[in-house]
Amino acid sequence: SYDLAVADNLRVQFAEIGQLNPDRETILTYIDDPKWSMVGKAVYQMHCTSCHGANGEGKIGPNLTDNLWKNVKVVEDIAKVVSEGAAGNAMPSWKTRLHPNEIVLVASYVASLRGTLPAGTGKIIPGEVPIPHWGEPPATEQAPADAVGSQESK
């Protein structure tokens, strides 16, 4: 069937990146990756829009585009909530329905939605609190050893 063909293709593609860890560094690394962010977006569109909206604005589930979060304090918490669920199963666990890499990639996509809707729009959930910025993805290149200025002085 088509679904099996898509699943087989995804497994072949995942062989390129191996098993992804649902940690801060990995999630931030894949936020801006053109190929893999599309996989995260596809997972989101297939499984998340009915509760969180097409743009993450929130419907039944919370707004994912603002700085107010209830079950997430750091970026890796997104993968944990996707995997384990939250709010007494209002947010279901996806760990038995998604490949572990899909969980990491959808977490990266959800993290990328932050700040994409104008302030004051989207659904507000009682108990949400402001959280710090996710931070920057890890550097992909090492600075030359003879670079002007040292990292310690910054």
Per-region residue spans from a language model:
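Alpha-helical transmembrane signal-anchor/signal-peptide segments
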Residues: S1-V6
